[in-house]
Design a protein with these regions (language model features):
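Canonical protein kinase catalytic loop motif
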Residues: 182-189
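An alpha-helical support segment within catalytic cores of ATP-dependent transferases
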Residues: 134-180
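Conserved ATP-binding subdomain of kinase catalytic cores across diverse folds
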Residues: 1-143, 188, 194-219
């Protein structure tokens, strides 16, 4: 990203050590990047903004009952600060990141690939397997849930086959999309705020998933 796509919102690549085997792709053992001066991660920034928002709401609880300002203007006033503008900026950086990831046509590891029927079925099977794991976990944890939520959890478990059936609709839809390399574990904790912009970190994918799955391109 920093060398070929000239994407500035990631730490600059400085070097890497690879393990190479005959007739196999090289494996990166360690990676050296530039340090990113920052004010903390964006998850903390968001929690701080939400905390201030709720403080303002509670502080104006009586006034808000008779508030006549348009909802959008009132929300901007209650959120306050720079957070709304920064959320817009983060959306722009996210789009630019994916454009950069899809920009390579020469490197096989990064070149976009067609989202064909095989890829479509693979996505469906992965989604179905993830849902199965979620239902299994929910059923196992059901006795530990607060009583207030158990009936709702049981309703979800009862609807398991219906929910899984709805996912199957994915196989009936055709698309001209492409698969590209993605971050793989993109959330606010993977972003640093510099005071003016954002730095995106940790492109190794979701650690709980197998490496073979993390290397797959997504649409």
């Amino acid at each position: 990203l920093s060398e070929r796509a000239d994407f500035p919102n990631v730490p600059a690549f400085l070097g890497a050590i690879e393990y190479r085997r005959p007739k196999a792709d090289p494996t990166v053992v360690c990676l050296l990047q530039s340090a990113a001066t920052n004010e903390g991660d964006v998850w903390t920034l968001t929690l701080d903004a939400m905390g201030r928002y709720y403080e303002r709401v509670l502080g104006r609880k009586a006034d808000l009952q008779n508030e006549t300002a348009p909802p959008g203007a009132l929300l901007d006033e209650l959120i306050g600060g720079i957070y709304p503008d920064k959320a817009t900026q983060l959306g722009q950086r996210t789009g630019e990141l994916h454009l950069a990831l899809a920009s390579s046509t020469e490197d096989r590891a990064f070149a976009p690939e067609p989202f064909n029927a095989m890829a479509q079925r693979s996505v469906y099977q992965n989604m179905r397997a993830s849902l199965r794991r979620a239902f299994t976990l929910l059923e196992r944890k059901l006795p530990e849930l607060p009583k207030a939520f158990r009936n709702e959890a049981k309703e979800v478990l009862t609807a398991e086959e219906e929910i899984l059936g709805r996912e199957k609709r994915l196989l009936d839809r055709h698309t001209n999309a492409a698969k590209i390399r993605i971050h793989g574990d993109y959330h606010l904790g993977q972003l640093l705020y510099t005071g003016k912009d954002f730095v995106i970190l940790d492109f190794e994918g979701e650690p709980a998933r197998p490496l073979s799955e993390r290397k797959l391109k997504r649409s």
